[in-house]
Amino acid sequence: MATNVNEEQYLDLIRYVLANGHQKGDRTGTGTKSVFGYQMRFDLSKGFPILTTKKVPFGLIKSELLWFLRGDTNIRFLLQHKNHIWDEWAFKKWVESDEYQGPDMTDFGHRWLKDPEFKQVYLQEKKAFCQRILEDDDFAQKYGDLGLVYGSQWRKWKTSQGDTIDQIANVIQQIKTTPDSRRMIVSAWNPEDVPSMALPPCHTMFQFYVNDGKLSCQLYQRSADIFLGVPFNIASYALLTHMIAHQCGLEPGEFVHTLGDAHIYLNHLDQVKEQLTRTPHEAPKLILPAEPKPIDQYEMTDIKLEGYTHEPAIKAPVAV
């Protein structure tokens, strides 16, 4: 079996944090083993870097990235593709509104994990909420929109003059016309917005680099949940690099993933240790349409993985 060099980058990160991590408290009250400043490099010519030592749901990664690239900030698109990653943020807005008359949902993010009875009520309320977002246009407009999330920051960055900047269109234009530029950057971190945001951006900025007909991308991620979040982030930004390279007539080069606070939650230690006992499979291949579409017009069926063999999923609690 060929060595999966890209996956070893991720498994080495787990080993490094287990061996060298500092025990820290955190916003969620769960506690972590954490290191500061770590970099992984994924050679995109050596297969698509989605983990094979556990199943990673590529459909969720695709629909979320397409949502960002459309500049969409309403969870309705995600729900139409059975993606529930962002539900809680919209649901929170609904249950804290004056219109909501249902059961008390105060601090639902923690309560449903600890109280089985409340969990049933919460899941029922959230399911009804999601169904209403899908069926009721006015309700979806009012409560499905998350405001300042990645889609808005990438495609409609609000300026002090009151207009907007399309950072994705700008960066594609730069790659095509001034490929040696050192300013090919997309930022999601706006200090003015951070205090009022539900969750300040974890992926704060990314930069592109062109060399020898290849496009590389580096992401700076301020906060990295190694077991649950990072596998998604690697696959998402690798997919983004492939798609933008395709737009610009380039081959994908490297995805460089730089982490700020890289942490394993204390309630994920058994899971990462189990993952380290597994042997990686060969990396799959990403298939995109022969001719690129406009970046905001890709459909789910345009993006495929070929030969994705993986070990079973490993369940773990989310820290909220």
Curated annotation (Swiss-Prot):
DUMP binds at residues 27, 182-183, 222-225, 233, 263-265. Pfam families: Thymidylat_synt (PF00303). One of its GO terms (cellular component) is cytosol. One of its GO terms (biological process) is dTMP biosynthetic process. Transmembrane segments: none annotated. It is an enzyme of class 2 (transferase). One of its GO terms (molecular function) is thymidylate synthase activity. The active site is at residue 202. (6R)-5,10-methylene-5,6,7,8-tetrahydrofolate binds at residues 225, 319. The keyword Metal-binding does not apply. InterPro entries: Thymidate_synth/dCMP_Mease, Thymidate_synth/dCMP_Mease_dom, Thymidate_synth/dCMP_Mease_sf, Thymidylate_synthase, Thymidylate_synthase_AS. It is found in: Cytoplasm. Its EC number is 2.1.1.45. Pathway: Pyrimidine metabolism; dTTP biosynthesis. Catalyzes the reductive methylation of 2'-deoxyuridine-5'-monophosphate (dUMP) to 2'-deoxythymidine-5'-monophosphate (dTMP) while utilizing 5,10-methylenetetrahydrofolate (mTHF) as the methyl donor and reductant in the reaction, yielding dihydrofolate (DHF) as a by-product. This enzymatic reaction provides an intracellular de novo source of dTMP, an essential precursor for DNA biosynthesis. Homodimer. This is Thymidylate synthase. It comes from Limosilactobacillus reuteri (strain DSM 20016).
